[in-house]
Amino acid sequence: MKFFVDTADVKEIRELNDLGLVDGVTTNPSLILKSGRDIIEVTKEICNIVKGPVSAEVAATEYEQMMKEAAVIARIADNICIKLPVTLDGLKACKALTSEGHKVNMTLCFSANQALLAAKAGATFISPFIGRLDDTGINGMELIAEIRTIYDNYDFRTEILAASVRTVNHVKEAALIGADVVTAPPATLKALVKHPLTYKGLETFLADWAKTGQKIA
């Protein structure tokens, strides 16, 4: 499984990348707003830090404008992945852009039908939103499972990028089901390593080591 970090905070991205935990980055208009920076400037900086795909989203709803904005975004760096909404115009833009060799991340996916159409349009990634579905009373993980089955049935190459991930349990369940990628906020990725018994065991080992009076280096 690949880990993408869902943020436009360059400091957080750099920290996680230095740990070897970042395979890519996802951003959206809300994260750009939170960063307080120009989208082109911050996206270019992120692309210079991370070697993997960096998703940057268009802010358009109609095909023609999507294509204009996608052209600007695509020029930022070679590892750019253009992010489009799963709408009819978005699917049309996806088909056109992937035909030109661009990577495309189809976002705001809430149904298996949408995921099927995105794969047919040649999307590089499909981003089903787990947490937002959970908020409506629908189990977001069931959607991941449905998409996995459909993609496996027809050997679609589109990768399932589990998004709107809020908890470490979301990450575990997505991995068990077979999502190709999880994108999560920095805090969630860092929380994956935490377990009380790990820290308790470490405390015991260090206390016993101190009693030996030895040094390794």
Swiss-Prot record:
InterPro entries: Aldolase_TIM, TAL/FSA, Transaldolase_3B, Transaldolase_3B/F6P_aldolase, Transaldolase_AS, TSA/FSA_arc/bac. One of its GO terms (molecular function) is aldehyde-lyase activity. GO terms for biological process: carbohydrate metabolic process; pentose-phosphate shunt. Disulfide bonds: none annotated. It comes from the Bacteria. The active site is at 83 (schiff-base intermediate with substrate). The keyword Transferase applies. Its main location: cytoplasm. Belongs to the transaldolase family. Type 3B subfamily. Transaldolase is important for the balance of metabolites in the pentose-phosphate pathway. This is Probable transaldolase. It comes from Brucella melitensis biotype 1 (strain ATCC 23456 / CCUG 17765 / NCTC 10094 / 16M). The gene is tal.
